[in-house]
Regions:
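Classical Sec-dependent N-terminal signal peptides that target proteins to the secretory pathway
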Residues: 1-18
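Beta-strand elements within well-structured catalytic alpha/beta cores of enzymes
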Residues: 39-43, 116, 211-221, 225, ...
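Short catalytic helix/loop segments, enriched in acidic residues and glycine
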Residues: 58-74
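ANL superfamily AMP-binding
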Residues: 69-83, 198-204
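GST-like fold's C-terminal all-alpha helical module
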Residues: 190-206, 211-219
Length: 288
């Protein structure tokens, strides 16, 4: 557990599954498993208004705050200063993520590239507690139960009623999506099961074509990808916190195994932001 925490605070590579430097492929040719073949950039959207107000956001389509806009601009500047260019940007259907993508691509003078918006990259849906203040929710349902909904891997909040305005099926935004694919609530496990098949079907093929990919998404959808890339257990992933608007770089070998991952930018500022988000989550847990 200490090793795990060190990675997420100091960005030390986590790749315990890849123990051999070299291996054979099907053509009996040596593959260097530590050679970077593919690179992927992940980024969580900038701060949103509900982040600031301590509200369960989920699929609620809220705006970026002034801080969130500034964070996105800084992220774009960091990527620009490190000479990053992209061929495709994948994002969710939620405007806090879309606008973060726009700001970053504008900084890179790359607003012309394809921006693919898909609900599979959306934040976790918080069901009946979505849009509610976290403290008020704790008073209504009890601290222990709300903590389980927030921090367990497989326990979802109560479902929405189908006629609830918060049901995505009742939202113009999702009118072309099969209703059976739209959630009434989700656990983190449900979110992972939504994100990973999409990544494998839509994003990996583009990476294999040599495309440089930016994924701008949300805390829990990015958690799902981290769990998949780093082969984290259900218990480990619930303790991973994703800071807003810091580029997270993943490097993979030919077999799409993680070689290393790291946040991009000034190390002191990165560590301060990671510490801030971890302390904020602890404060919320204690506040409930």
């Amino acid at each position: 557990m200490l090793y795990f925490l060190i990675f997420f605070i100091f960005q030390i590579n986590v790749n315990t599954s890849n123990k051999n430097l070299l291996s054979f492929n099907q053509q009996d040719k040596y593959i260097d498993n530590n050679k970077t073949i593919y690179k992927l950039v992940l980024i969580r959207h900038g701060q949103s208004s509900f982040n600031e107000e301590n509200i369960f956001t989920g699929w609620t389509d809220v705006e970026l705050t002034k801080t969130g806009i500034e964070e996105a601009n800084i992220a774009g500047e960091i990527l620009k200063n490190n000479s990053y260019k992209f061929d495709i940007c994948f994002t969710s259907t939620l405007k806090r993520s879309i606008k973060t993508s726009f700001i970053i691509l504008d900084k890179l003078n790359q607003l012309y590239i394809p921006l693919i918006k898909d609900f599979h990259l959306n934040e976790r849906h918080y069901g009946a507690i979505q849009g509610l203040n976290k403290k008020e929710t704790s008073l209504k349902y009890g601290k222990n139960l709300v903590y389980k909904w927030r921090r367990s891997y497989s326990i979802p909040p109560p479902k929405l009623n189908e006629n609830d305005i918060r049901n995505p099926a009742n939202n113009e935004q999702y009118k072309n999506i099969n209703k059976t694919e739209l959630p009434l609530t989700e656990s983190l496990e449900d979110t992972v099961k939504r994100v990973i098949p999409y990544f494998e079907k839509e994003i990996i093929p583009e990476m294999k074509k040599g495309k440089n990919i930016l994924v701008c998404a949300h805390g829990n959808s990015i958690r799902g990808l981290i769990k998949y890339f780093d082969k984290l257990s259900d218990e480990e992933i619930v303790h991973v916190d994703i800071p807003n608007a810091i580029p997270l770089i993943y490097e993979f070998n030919e077999n799409f195994e993680t070689i290393k991952s790291y946040y991009l930018g000034d190390i002191d500022k990165i560590n301060a932001k990671i510490k801030f988000i971890k302390n904020l989550e602890k404060q919320i847990d204690n506040f409930l």
